[in-house]
Amino acid sequence: MIQLAQNAKHPSKKEQKPLVNEQIAFNQFTLIDENSTNLGIVKMENALKLAQEKQLDLVLIAPNPTKPIVKLLDFGRYTYDLKRKKRQAKKNQTIIQTKEVVVKPTIAKHDLEFRAKQSKNWIEKGHHVKFIVRAFGRVSTRIELIEKVFDDFYQLVKDVVEIQKPLTASSKTMYAALLVPLKR
């Protein structure tokens, strides 16, 4: 028999729902009513009767073994509010991308200006820019030429960026710097 392996990138995410009413395994717990008033330590039977009278559910909020906390509320409304909060948090997330500008030390002035203009657009959108200088052969030993290219590029974009990580050698033939938007 062949077994299928689970996808390593996307493992199954089973959302764990809070325990409700009879699912709660504690005999007594701290009960909080729908108005957030602490009713003290209550036995399970009494809490279930109270929940039925008020047509609400018992929901385990804090499953602490020594002091479990259960709240009296409408479970449907509670799950709806949780989903809505999760959706809102996801909508408010901002994703910062790192764009790369790769140049050679012998790049022409116009080409460097074009890359700087492109980088300014990315920075204004809130992205980070990784400036990479690739130097092959004898040019890789001429560090002053590599630093000059970076300085020229920085002079073109310095009004919108700040250097988060200065130009450093990431390998024998590659130098990189990280530029981020100015904090205003």
Swiss-Prot record:
Entry keyword Transport: no
| Cellular compartments per GO CC | cytosol
Give an example GO biological process.
Answer: ribosome disassembly
Q: Does the keyword Transferase apply?
A: no
Q: Where on the tree of life does the source sit, at the highest rank?
A: Bacteria
Q: Keywords, A to Z?
A: Cytoplasm, Initiation factor, Protein biosynthesis
The UniProt entry, under InterPro entries, shows: T_IF-3_C_sf, T_IF-3_N_sf, Translation_initiation_fac3_CS, Translation_initiation_fac_3, Translation_initiation_fac_3_C, Translation_initiation_fac_3_N
A GO MF label: translation initiation factor activity
What protein family is recorded? Belongs to the IF-3 family.
Function of the protein:
IF-3 binds to the 30S ribosomal subunit and shifts the equilibrium between 70S ribosomes and their 50S and 30S subunits in favor of the free subunits, thus enhancing the availability of 30S subunits on which protein synthesis initiation begins.
Q: Any idea what this protein is called?
A: Translation initiation factor IF-3
Species source reads Mycoplasma genitalium (strain ATCC 33530 / DSM 19775 / NCTC 10195 / G37) (Mycoplasmoides genitalium)
